[in-house]
Regions:
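Cofactor-binding active-site loop characterized by glycine-rich and histidine/acidic residues
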Residues: 1-102, 112, 117-122, 136
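Glycine-rich ThDP/TPP pyrophosphate-binding loop and its adjacent helix/strand module
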Residues: 66-70, 81-97, 102-183
Length: 183
């Protein structure tokens, strides 16, 4: 399990349910028939982890299970691109879910293709650099600002270089009155 995910789960505690879309994290943490996850974990489609987590959160509310944390942990491809609509809906509906984006700035699992998280002028296999190209022609999408624009109560950026800060931000996100976003 990657260090960042260990830190997030350590902060969230054992009473946590995680939904993760297809992507680098899912491929490396669940080689059939095994799993690295030590909490209830749901593998969703690439585009709908936020919708799956929304259903989990509604079911927990229905059964008055307010002590269970619901997380989505997804990469930048599912967050910035393919699952963007479901995330927007989750934010808009106010589900009490912490969405953690594991941002490596490209579709790494399938060959380092550009995503909306890839920085301006960065080299990827689909945005090469050279005489005819400076690399990625688009600026990186500002997902934190988009979350703020949705009125998300808790939005933060973090780095595994600062583990104490990451843990603190996860704990704060779990006490938010509504959705939270950490990148």
């Amino acid at each position: 399990m990657p260090t960042a995910i260990k830190l997030v789960l350590d902060a969230a505690g054992p009473n946590t349910i995680v939904a993760s879309p297809t992507g680098c994290l899912e491929v490396t943490s669940t080689p059939f028939p095994e799993s690295s996850w030590r909490v209830p974990w749901i593998h969703s489609l690439f585009e709908n982890a936020a919708a799956v987590a929304s259903g989990v959160e509604v079911a927990l509310k229905r059964f008055k299970r307010t002590d269970t944390n619901v997380l989505v942990i997804g990469g930048d491809g599912s967050t910035f691109d393919i699952g963007f609509g479901a995330i927007s809906g989750m934010f808009d509906r106010g589900h009490r879910i912490t969405y953690v984006c594991y941002d490596n700035e490209a579709y790494m699992n399938t060959g380092v293709q550009r995503s909306a998280s890839t920085p301006f002028c960065a080299k990827t296999t689909t945005t090469p650099t050279g005489k005819m190209s400076l690399g990625n022609p688009r600026p990186k999408k500002d997902m934190a600002a988009i979350a703020v624009a949705h009125g998300v109560p808790y939005v933060a950026t973090a780095s595994i270089a600062y583990p104490v800060d990451l843990r603190r931000k996860v704990k704060m996100s779990l006490s938010a009155d509504g959705p939270a976003y950490i990148q």
